[in-house]
């Protein structure tokens, strides 16, 4: 029987808000999401508060979540080994997510490191996850293109999945960071990824509009 996992991502929705969302409101909202039945909730981030002030209260939010009566798992984003070392100490967290950008420019803007350095970081985080019984989810940022003029085509995205899988990564979320994907590029990437790497798990993380959301979801679903 085929299984599709739904991952809800309040962390991504919240992190760009300029006005700080009170911790108790975050807790209340995420607790409601935990009642829905999502496979996983991407709820917070173990990164520097200077980088993402909105998520500086991730530990407080975690302490306020009601996990006793839910099957939903928790995912937290990390951007370096220090953050991963902190996140793996929490038994409540099942997944660590790392944003790996296919765009060199965005990788430096987002994590203050090059793609080459990020490969070393991912390798270290993967070893941490194995030791602490966590799973690493690699968010393939700018997975469908970028606005910086950095080289991109679908085969470049597939190349980086292959490279990262050699480090032991098994879960990849192909992320349309700036909303440039379309059904054709989605179909090409997922049909080729699933064929080339049948043992890996692939997810689709789209930024879209109401008008184009369903056609993107359908393209990914039809090529699962």
Predicted regions and their residues:
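Hydrophobic faces of well-ordered beta-strands that scaffold small-molecule active sites
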Residues: 4-12, 39-43, 72-78, 94-98, ...
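N-terminal small/glycine-rich loop or linker at the start of catalytic domains
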Residues: 1-18, 98-110, 131-148, 193, ...
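Catalytic alpha/beta core domains of metabolic enzymes, predominantly
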Residues: 177-223
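Conserved anion-binding
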Residues: 103-170, 175-177
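Alpha-helix-loop-beta-strand connector modules within alpha/beta enzyme cores
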Residues: 51-76, 116-138, 186-204
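Glycine-enriched alpha-helix->loop->beta-strand junction motifs that scaffold or abut catalytic
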Residues: 37, 89-96, 166-170, 192-201, ...
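Glycine-rich, positively charged N-terminal anion/phosphate-binding segment
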Residues: 23-24, 28-32, 36-69, 78-86, ...
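Glycine-rich, proline-tolerant flexible connector loops at the mouths of alpha/beta enzymes
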Residues: 39-64, 98-113, 142-148, 173-184
């Amino acid at each position: 029987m085929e299984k599709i996992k739904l991952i809800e991502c309040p962390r991504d929705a919240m992190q760009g808000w300029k006005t700080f969302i009170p911790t108790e409101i975050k807790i209340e909202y995420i607790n409601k999401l935990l009642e829905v039945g999502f496979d996983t909730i991407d709820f917070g981030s173990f990164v520097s508060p200077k980088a993402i002030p909105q998520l500086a209260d991730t530990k407080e939010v975690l302490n306020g979540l009601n996990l006793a009566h839910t099957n939903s798992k928790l995912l937290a984003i990390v951007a370096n080994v220090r953050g991963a070392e902190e996140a793996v100490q929490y038994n409540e967290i099942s997944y660590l997510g790392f944003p790996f950008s296919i765009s060199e420019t965005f990788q430096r803007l987002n994590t203050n490191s090059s793609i080459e350095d990020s490969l070393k970081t991912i390798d270290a985080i993967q070893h941490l996850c194995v030791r602490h019984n966590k799973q690493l989810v690699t968010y393939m940022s700018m997975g469908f293109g970028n606005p910086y003029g950095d080289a991109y085509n679908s085969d470049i995205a597939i190349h980086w999945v292959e490279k990262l899988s050699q480090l032991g990564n098994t879960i990849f979320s192909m992320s349309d960071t700036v909303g440039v994907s379309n059904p054709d590029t989605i179909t090409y990437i997922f049909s080729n990824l699933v064929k080339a790497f049948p043992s890996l798990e692939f997810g689709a993380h789209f930024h879209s509009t109401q008008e184009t959301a369903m056609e993107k979801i359908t393209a990914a679903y039809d090529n699962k």
